[in-house]
Amino acid sequence: VYKRQDKDSPRYVSFEFLESSGKCFNEKISPVIVFVNESKEGIKKAISYFKKPILQFHGDESQDFCSSFNLPYIKAISMNEKDFQNKIIEFADAFAILLDSGGQKIRGGTGKTFDWKLIPKEIKNNLIIAGGLNSNNITSLIKSYKPYGVDLASGVESKPGKKDITELKHFLKIVDEI
């Protein structure tokens, strides 16, 4: 996963990094590139380095904008938004919907969970859950909601933007045993 977010984000990556990383992938691997309100030109440049990227949008992008690249995309929707259910319907063509606890100022990586009881049961898209996931709560989430995937950030980091390998291995071991 490459996070092409705002430059102040600890998870930000440059175009130069994307270009050098793109040389490591073939068409069998689909990297996910995360964008927050990036320009169409910036997205086109970022995806040009990869054969089969998946786009992940965490900003205020419209459905028309997200689908205009003719690539699979994931749309992040904050469960703190009043109209989150309408947003889920709006992005029905998305490869996946990512439900997160972020808001307008902090788009993700908050380390906070949202109330999982708010997850709509009738989502037709693949469902990815984010927000405060760690080795203490992942079993409950997966057993109760069976998401297509989970998105990790601060729950397995030793500091913002730096994954803790020991915690990540522990997390993956738990998931593997479910």
What are these regions (language model features)?
Residues V1-Y2:
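Short, small-residue-biased leader/transition segments that mark boundaries at the very start
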Residues D6-L71:
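N-terminal active-site wall of soluble small-molecule enzyme domains
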Residues E16-C24, Y49, D60-S154, S158-I178:
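Short loop-to-alpha-helix "cap/lid" segments that border enzyme active sites
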